[in-house]
From Swiss-Prot:
Name recorded for this polypeptide: 2-succinyl-6-hydroxy-2,4-cyclohexadiene-1-carboxylate synthase
Subunit-level organization: Monomer.
EC number: 4.2.99.20
Signal peptide: none
Family: Belongs to the AB hydrolase superfamily. MenH family.
Gene designation per UniProt: menH
Function of the molecule: Catalyzes a proton abstraction reaction that results in 2,5-elimination of pyruvate from 2-succinyl-5-enolpyruvyl-6-hydroxy-3-cyclohexene-1-carboxylate (SEPHCHC) and the formation of 2-succinyl-6-hydroxy-2,4-cyclohexadiene-1-carboxylate (SHCHC).
Alphabetical keyword list: Lyase, Menaquinone biosynthesis
Pfam families for the chain: Abhydrolase_6
GO molecular function: 2-succinyl-6-hydroxy-2,4-cyclohexadiene-1-carboxylate synthase activity
Length: 252
């Protein structure tokens, strides 16, 4: 079994750019950024429980990493960068720390490196279970209307929220709930030590208005790019800023 994805081919000899969307996103989420790098082959992946991969269920990050490895092999991708937002960033960090043959580097936008104590994990587990129950039982428009009121999305205006609620409500609530629980921060290990000891290139992007993730970025041994005029979802709010940072990263 492999993950559903869309492949766009560039020039031979350059590494692939493998894009991983956030929770409730889809393989189109990164395309405005990705299409600015037409020389590179690009793979836009649907994570389990989402879009073309909605029928794929996982028990945890190990399963996601295994599926991602098999997906890259199926496309004969031998050298690549992982570029992930939020949940996709956490998947990228986990996969990189577990080992991905052919990995050139990781670019994470607004991805959490992991909670640091049992109390935080227990609190997050309670919260994610409550959200998962709502995703399973309530209309998605109502759930996402509340989802985008969370503090991390404070930089969004009302029009941006309405647009995201409409877009995300095309998902399957039951499969989203299953993925939310399987990849909860409550079950993700703290990756700070692994990332400090890494053997791969690691870059972190965060919006200048995303105070929570700017603070987290400061804890990581990573080259951090702050994206102007953007909050948590920087590649949506300022794609040109993210394109500029990614171009700078790929030039090294």
């Amino acid at each position: 079994m492999i993950l559903h994805a869309q492949a766009k081919h560039g020039k031979p000899g350059l590494p692939w750019l493998v894009f991983l969307h956030g929770f409730s996103g889809d393989c189109h989420e990164w395309q405005e950024v990705g299409e600015a790098f037409a020389d590179y082959s690009r793979l836009y992946v649907y994570l389990p429980g989402h879009g073309g991969s909605a029928a794929i269920s996982v028990d945890g990050f190990d399963d996601v990493t295994d599926l991602l490895r098999k997906t890259l092999v199926s496309y004969n991708i031998l050298n690549f960068w992982l570029v992930g937002y939020s949940l996709g960033g956490r998947v990228a960090m986990m996969a990189a720390c577990q080992g991905m043959p052919g990995l050139c580097g990781v670019v994470v936008e607004g991805g959490h490196p992991g909670l640091q104590n049992a109390e935080q994990r227990a609190e997050r587990q309670r919260s994610d279970r409550q959200w998962a129950q709502r995703f399973r039982t309530e209309p998605l428009t109502a759930v996402f209307a509340d989802w985008y009121q969370q503090p991390v999305f404070a930089s969004l205006n009302d029009d941006q929220r309405r647009e995201l609620v409409a877009l995300r409500s095309n998902n399957n609530g039951a499969t989203l709930a299953a993925m939310l629980e399987a990849t909860s921060l409550a079950v993700q290990p703290d990756l700070r030590a692994n990332l400090s000891a890494r053997t791969f290139a690691f870059y972190y992007l965060c919006g200048e208005r995303d105070s929570k993730f700017r603070a987290l970025a400061a804890e990581l041994a990573a080259d951090c790019h702050v994206i102007p005029r953007a909050g948590h979802n920087a590649h949506r709010e300022n794609p040109a800023g993210v394109i500029a940072s990614l171009a700078q990263i790929l030039r090294f």
